[in-house]
Amino acid sequence: MKHNNIPQQTHFIGVLLPEDITCRLEDCRRYMNKAYGCKSGHGTPIHVTLVPPFKLPEEYATADLILAIEKDVLPKRLGFTAYIDNFDAFGDRTLFANVIADDAWTKLRDETVKAILNACPGCTKKDKKPFQPHATVSNRDIPAGVMTKVLQVMNELNLAEDFPVDNITIFERKGNRWEAGATLEFSIY
């Protein structure tokens, strides 16, 4: 019998989206659940991930992450206005609201990763791929072969929205769910 030796992920860092966009994307999740039975990721608040899930070593706590972001990221005034341009997908596996990538997203991600690694060395690592910000609607349990139709339906919604990137949120695993543990707000001006 094979045992899973992957450490249980405990935290990730992201940006919560405004309530109006969150409500629209929650409607999309409900559609994916009703039409295709999708449930994966639907319990997680709508967000853009900056630092993917990682296991925080026992000698550290969420408070250490909060302090690192307050000390090393918030003073840099990295808030900005972002833009969603409809929907896209990573293959057949992940449907997302297409957040337009730019240097402001990359800088916010890089500074956040650096702060987390300074506070809790080795707990995560910077992704080597170019940063593609996105707000996941459904993932992992989308039936094979339906993504083209799903994208056609979703893109008929013409989701085109500006939104403020005005927070960094630390998500914590509670049982089998991710919850917003702490949200650190900042100005976009």
Report each predicted region and the residues it spans:
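Basic, often amphipathic N-terminal segments
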Residues: 1-81, 102-161, 167, 177-189
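Glycine-rich beta-strand-turn "strand-cap" elements at beta-sheet edges
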Residues: 87-90, 165-178
